[in-house]
From Swiss-Prot:
Protein species of origin: Streptococcus equi subsp. zooepidemicus (strain MGCS10565)
Disulfide bond entries: none
Reaction(s) catalysed (UniProt annotation): a (3R)-hydroxyacyl-[ACP] = a (2E)-enoyl-[ACP] + H2O
Location(s), subcellular: Cytoplasm
Broad enzyme group: lyase
Alphabetical list of InterPro entries matching this protein: FabA_FabZ (IPR013114), FabZ (IPR010084), HotDog_dom_sf (IPR029069)
Top-level taxonomic group: Bacteria
Family named by the database record: Belongs to the thioester dehydratase family. FabZ subfamily.
Catalytic residues, chain numbering: H47
Role played: Involved in unsaturated fatty acids biosynthesis. Catalyzes the dehydration of short chain beta-hydroxyacyl-ACPs and long chain saturated and unsaturated beta-hydroxyacyl-ACPs.
GO biological process, one term: fatty acid biosynthetic process
Annotated protein name in UniProt: 3-hydroxyacyl-[acyl-carrier-protein] dehydratase FabZ
Length: 140
């Protein structure tokens, strides 16, 4: 388990782009994290004021950050940056709204050199909200 201070040690992201609140569990290849979605999120001001919905691209960013915590916490990757190299099979199944808690799972399925591939999903109340295969490239 990791708290927000430990997450900030691993990730370079800060408010308003830090989208992981807590790590619930982690192994060598899999990590589970949460994001508590509140009405105070800056993106709700414009998406949409009358019906606030978390943008799908930010759900995918939260999943990427979840995977990033796992990799950037490893001694050999400390201080490196990780960049999106691609997304495949992305599906949005459920709207994420203020008051929801996203439970995010990322599982590494392939690592080769500076490239990593992750299967990721985000759930709310046990129901799938979003999923996809994410590809990352590690910078120096």
């Amino acid at each position: 388990m990791m708290d927000i201070k430990q997450i900030q040690e691993a990730l370079p992201h800060r408010y308003p782009m830090l989208l992981v609140d807590r790590i619930l569990e982690a192994s060598d290849d899999e990590i589970v994290a949460i994001k508590n979605v509140t009405i105070n999120e800056p993106f709700f001001n414009g998406h949409f004021p009358q019906y606030p919905v978390m943008p799908g691209v930010l759900i995918m960013e939260a999943l990427a950050q979840t995977a990033g915590v796992l990799e950037l916490s490893k001694e050999e990757n400390k201080g490196k940056l990780v960049f999106y190299a691609g997304m495949d099979k992305v599906k949005f199944k459920k709207q994420v709204v203020p008051g929801d808690q996203l439970v995010m799972t990322a599982r590494f399925i392939k690592r080769r050199g500076t490239i990593a591939v992750v299967e990721a999903k985000a759930e709310v109340d046990g129901k799938l909200a979003a999923s996809g295969t994410l590809t990352f490239a590690f910078g120096q």
